[in-house]
C-alpha cells in the first residue's frame, strides 16, 4: 500500500531511528495530509523501541498521538503529565461565584470571572460533578488546560 511505502521511505531515510524529534511537524499541512502523517507516526511508535518527542501548537494532534504532555510557557515547565490522566483529571466548571466558593480547597485551579458567572479549571472532575450535580462541569480539553495554566484565562 502507499502508506506502507511512505513508512518504509521515512524509515529508510532516517536509518530506522529509535527516537524522532519533531518540531511543528504537522503545521501548515492540510487535514488529509496531517492525518496521514499522524497515522505514520502512530505506526512508528507501535514498536516499543520507538519514541517521538514532538513540539506542536496543534493540541488536537497531541491529544491524538501523545502519551505524555509537557507544557512549556515562556521558558517555564508548567506541567508534565500522562496525557490520559491529565484529560481525565481536569474539568471546566461553569457556575456562579456562590457555588464556586462551596467547593473544598484545592479543587479549583484557576478561575475566569465574567458577567454571567465563573468558568474554572478544576481538579478531580468526577468529584466536582458529584459535589455539584446542578452545575455543568465539562471534560477539559488540552487547549483549556493550557490556557488556564498559562494565565490567559485566569483572573
What is each residue range found by the language model?
Residues 1-6, 10:
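Single conserved hydrophobic/aromatic residue that forms the stacking wall/gate
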Amino acid at each position: 500500500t502507499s502508506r506502507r511505502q511512505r513508512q518504509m521511505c521515512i524509515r529508510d531515510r532516517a536509518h530506522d531511528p529509535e527516537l524522532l524529534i519533531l518540531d511543528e511537524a504537522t503545521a501548515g499541512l492540510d487535514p488529509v495530509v496531517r492525518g496521514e502523517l499522524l497515522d505514520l507516526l502512530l505506526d512508528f511508535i507501535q514498536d516499543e523501541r520507538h519514541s517521538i518527542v514532538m513540539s506542536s501548537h496543534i493540541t488536537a494532534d497531541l491529544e491524538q498521538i501523545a502519551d505524555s504532555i509537557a507544557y512549556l510557557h515562556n521558558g517555564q515547565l508548567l506541567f508534565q503529565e500522562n496525557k490520559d490522566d491529565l484529560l481525565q483529571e481536569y474539568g471546566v466548571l461553569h457556575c456562579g461565584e456562590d457555588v464556586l466558593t462551596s467547593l473544598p480547597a484545592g479543587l479549583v485551579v484557576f478561575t475566569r470571572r465574567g458577567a454571567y458567572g465563573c468558568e474554572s479549571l478544576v481538579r478531580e472532575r468526577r468529584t466536582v460533578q458529584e459535589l455539584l450535580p446542578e452545575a455543568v462541569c465539562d471534560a477539559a480539553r488540552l487547549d483549556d488546560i493550557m490556557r488556564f495554566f498559562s494565565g490567559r484565562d485566569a483572573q
